[in-house]
Amino acid sequence: MNDRMPPNIEYQSGHGAGAAVSAESTVPLVVDLDGTLTPTDTLFESLVQLLKHSPMQIIRLPLALLRGRAGFKHFIATHSSISADYLPYRQDFLDYLREQKSKGRRIILATAAHESIANKVAAHLGLFETVLASNPDHNLKGTAKLQAIREQIGPVFVYAGDSSADLPIWRASSAAVLVGVAPAVAARVREEVAVEREFPKAGLEFKTWLRALRVHQWLKNLLLFVPLLTAFSFLDVEKLTTMAVAFLAFSLAASATYMVNDLWDLQSDRQHPRKRFRPFASAQIPIHIGLAVAALALVLSFVMSVFV
C-alpha cells in the first residue's frame, strides 16, 4: 500500500470508471484545470481572445516569450479575457466533485493556468476552498505545482490530472484520479499509485472532423463542374482533372475559413443553445489542433490553385 495513505482508508486500483475507493475518503482532493476540469486549454483560449480583441499585441508576443512561461502567461492574461461561465466542463467529473464537496471533502484547484483565470473558474463553480495557480513569477506546473501543494495542503492528498506532466504529482500523492488520461500514461500511474476514480476520455470520431471541416458545404463547389456539362466536355480528362483540383482548392479554403471563424466565435457560440455543441466550442477538438489543420488546409488550397 502507498505509504502516503492514511491507515484508515483503503484504496483499490482498478480499470475503467468503476475503479473506486472502498471507503469514503477524507483526504483533500487537488484538481487540475486544463484538460481535467475542462477539456480545453485556457492559454490557447486566451490567446485566441487576444488575437481577436487586441490584434496589435501580436508584435509583442516574441518579447513576452522571453519572459519565460510564467511571464508569457501573464502577458496573455493581462491582454485578454475569457468567461469561466461558458467554458466547457467535464460534466461527469464535475458531478463527482460536487458529490465529494457535499460529503465535506476539501477540494483544491491547482493549475498551471494564470491565477486570474483560475480565480474566475473557482468563483463560478464554488467548489474550491483554495486556489493554487501560476502568477507573473512562477509557472505552477510539474514539480513546482507539487511543491506548492505540499506547502499549502500537506503531504497527504489525492490528485486529479490528465497528462504525463502530472506524473511527479501522482507519484507523491496518496491516490490518483485519472481524467481523460491517455492509456499509456494511465498504465504508468496504476503501476505506481492507487487509483481512486477514472473518467475516460471520449474518442475523437471521424464525423466530428467532418462537422468541423463543414464537408457538407463542399457540395456548393460542385457548381464548378457545370460548365463542363453544358459544354459537353465532361469526358475531357484534362479539363476534369483541372476542375477536380479547383474543387478541392475551393473546398479546403472554405473549410479553413469555417474553422477559423468557429475559433473566433468560441465564447459567443458557447452561449448559443445549438452552436455550443460544435467541435471547437465543446472542446472536442483542441484549439491548437484546429489552428494547425486550418493552416494546413490553406497551404494545400494555395498550392493546388497554382496548378489550376
Predicted regions: what is each one?
Residues E10-A77:
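Active-site neighborhood of HAD-like aspartate-dependent phosphohydrolases
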Residues I58-I59, Q271-V308:
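Multi-pass membrane catalytic core of lipid/isoprenoid biosynthesis enzymes
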Residues A160, A253-P279:
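Acidic (Asp/Glu-rich) catalytic motifs at the cytosolic membrane interface
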Residues V226, D236-W264:
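Membrane-embedded alpha-helical segments that form the functional core of polytopic membrane enzymes
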Residues F44, L219-L223, E238-A249, I289-V293, ...:
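Alpha-helical transmembrane segments of integral membrane proteins
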Residues N2-A23, A84-F234:
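C-terminal cap/substrate-recognition subdomain and adjoining C-terminal extension
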